[in-house]
């Protein structure tokens, strides 16, 4: 628990002063509130004794001043508390988001995307509420409890002892509730992750859901996930609901005893030396003790709920990236040569088999390499090792003659532009999306990159041209247009190595040929690695690599492979005669 608190406390930073100021302001507020019943008791006794109007005015003025002070300090405490808790939550979100940005793909794979979203939103909101209660309510309630009990003891000692018996009973009950509810809330948050998984998957694949008329199935699937959350949350809340009635019973029982026994002693003068003013103040202090205990109950409830959230947040903040830049990292890539020296790779140490086995491949700077293989042959896995999105399990990968582990990650990835299988565009203008490749790109540079990617032609047809708004995920452009924009974005990086991971699959063959022709003419010194299903997309490459089940099955020119490689021959024949591809090999890349 201490490590969790220390980790979260780092996010307080500039809000440390307001976090400390809030309890101080609350202390003044509580002192005034506890002093008011004492003054009222004296005023009642003075009035019983037949005091003058001057005395009443003097006491009334004192009460008004104390009430105003309490109001001012209470309002100030509320403002500083809101500022500190909101600032703490903002810093925590930033710290988590920045940490996630440093994660490797392996780290991301460890947490599901929906789980990370839940931790960034719901979990942080829970911790924010708990923090707000801790710096204000959790300070106010114990102070109110102690001061009210002390004042009550001063005014009616033996009568105030009643609360010494009720408070331990309440604490025992509270501990039992905490022990029972904590594991249930842990289960609730796991179910929240599953619910978010369902929502995210459905929203992202809405077009597929509708095209297959699967709305009813998705509704049932979501309803089941929501029901699981409801069921476990209800169980947890049933236990937490015992907290309030238990508190009320104990404290109201104490108040009834105070009222009954106190009134009896006032009437019969049984030696408690308790007068009417003191009796009225004792009732006020009893009420303050009641409210303090009730609020403490709420604080503990919130802390119980937020404890699991805090642990989940700390899991993210404590996760160390599996890929980091070394000390004294190289900040310059000499050229675009790539060497795979007997590389083997698997995504998880627990995996039984390698995704890639004994890959020995040497690519010269400026060379064009085509990669073909069936789905499941690990084509994408191979190219992800070049910008060090994953680390090899065995062997080494070199770029510019240097092991990728020796480079600064930002330097390496700036020189290796990858257009991934799944093309992603962000909400914003076409210019905004293109500038992901180069934030300082000029309009002329963007237009040139789009001409090379054969995107300028369709962009010019839009009314707003390069200022056309792209919806989230590029939902308002076609698959082929999206691919060409992503290629243009990569070209703006002016990389030494350009990797196209099946990035023209949605483009017609004529446009694909134009893109390849433009690359030959304008990018002669750039190393190009092209993954494709169509042989026509790679047949002009200097060499073509055929992958099968994560191993090199053949390598050579188009003509050499046609003469010597059985897989290449079969696919070439099927594509020229009937449009076949490598998918018959099975699996997923």
Give names to the regions the model predicted.
Residues 13-17, 102-106, 122-135, 139, ...:
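An intracellular "coupling" helix at the cytosolic face of ABC transporter transmembrane type-1 domains
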Residues 49, 86, 94-118, 122-124, ...:
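Short intracellular "coupling" helices and adjacent cytoplasmic loop segments at the cytosolic face
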Residues 14, 18-31, 72, 132-188, ...:
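Transmembrane helices of ABC transporter permease
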Residues 1-33, 40, 48-63, 77-81, ...:
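Membrane-integrated ABC transporters
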Residues 1, 24-25, 32-45, 66-113, ...:
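Juxtamembrane helix-loop junctions of ABC transporter transmembrane domains
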Residues 332-589:
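ABC-type nucleotide-binding domain
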Residues 51-58, 65, 151-165, 235-312, ...:
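Helix-loop-helix
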